[in-house]
Each structure stands twice: as structure tokens, then as C-alpha cells.
Amino acid sequence: MKPSEISLVSYARGPGLGPCLRTGATAARAFAYSHDIPLIGVNHCVAHLEIGLLEGATDPVLLYLSGANTQVIAYASEKYRVFGETIDIGIGNGLDKFAREAGMGFPGGPKIEKLAKGPELLDLPYSVKGMDMAFSGLMTAAKSKLDSGHSIETVTYSLQENAFAMSCEVAERALAHTGKTELVLGGGVACNERLREMATIMTEERGVKCFIPSKDLCVDNGVMIGWLGHQMVNGEYKITEEDNKVHQKYRTDMVEVTWR
């Protein structure tokens, strides 16, 4: 592809780690300005939601589970509203932290998934309040169970079941609260087959539809960033100078959704 064939450069301006965001923004600006191409910075979390809509959903609740972010989101009053979220650590970071302390290495999520065979379900903290969740106590308790002599298979199974049950519970509460009839999964943790199974069971029992993107679209990817930029510039979103500055704490509900 030639630069002359590119009509827009889109990059993630936040949320995220400052050095990573600035590196991406610098590269995007340099390329866009040198070839006189329009530039837009987009919200990483909203990009996960928008790419999920390509599965066929029209007005869903998004269960967004990644390393740093754990949120249940839905569109209301011209913004994607956060109806519930983690109040301590993201589910993915929690799983990675447990795996690291258990000597399993990084990334922890896929390794936990392979080991989580059960069959015994240990008593671990289940922390849900309304549509908010907390995972740090769960991870600490799981490590204590491992240190006390329980097998890694039993501990990872119990840890995974608890974490995903909490996530599916808040998703179901959001469906009930909003009256929406579609659920979309997003984020790297949504690659987990057990989570996909639990979300599918929950939505079937509730009588709503479940849309799960392919795994290469659940993890962070350039397609979702480009697609959201395309949606925004074709949906009467007015690009300002502020839109091209990185924002480490760029929350989902800070974005004006003009393209719906």
C-alpha cells in the first residue's frame, strides 16, 4: 500500500501507559504529517466495543475484560456508559500476577486456562457489589491455597471459575438494568474458552444473544483502532487539537459518540 492510498491515520491515545501511548502517537503523527494525511486519536476501550459490533450486535452490553481494564459498558445518552468495573485491579493483571507468583511465567492467563482442570472447587473470595468487582483478594487467597498444599490444577480451576462467574454476574445485571438483549465480549481475557462458554450459557438462560469476536479481534489489534477512527470521521465527529494528545486516563465514558 502507498501513502497516497491512505485516507486516515488512527492511533490509540488512551487509556494506557504513558511511554507506550507516546511512542504510538509520535509514530502516527510523523507518518500522517509527512504525507499530509488526516490524523485522529481514539479511545482504546471504545475500539474494543466497536470492533465487537461487527459480529452483528446493534445495541449490546459489552463485557470488557483485559489486563488493565474490567468494565461492563453500554450505550446511553450519546456515550458509552460504564455501569460497573473493577475497583482494584484488572482481571487480566490479576491472573498474570497470580501466575508470576506461582512460578508459571508470563503471560499467565493462557497458562492458567490450560491448567484449570479441577474438579474440586475451593472456597475463594467472591467480591461483587452491584455491578462492581474486586479481584485482588481473590488472587491473594488463591496463592494462599496453593502455598497450603492444594494442587495447581485445583487452585487455577477455582480461581478461574470465581473470576469469570463474577464477570458474568455483573454482565447479567447490566443486561437486566439496561433492558438490552445482546452481550458482546471484548478484551484479551475474552480469548479464554471457559469464559466464552460461561457467557454463552448465561445469555442462553436469559434469552438474549451473545456475540463473541474471533480471538485475533479480542486481543489488542490495529484493526479495531483503524475501524473506530473510520467510524468517527464518517460520523460527524469533529477532530480537535485535544484529540491528538495522549491521555493516560481516557475513560470510556469521556468519548462523545456521534457516529451512532
Language-model features: locations:
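Conserved phosphate-binding/catalytic loops in two-lobed NTP-binding clefts
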Residues: 41-42, 183, 200-225
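Glycine-rich phosphate-binding/hydrolytic loop that grips phosphoryl groups
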Residues: 213-257
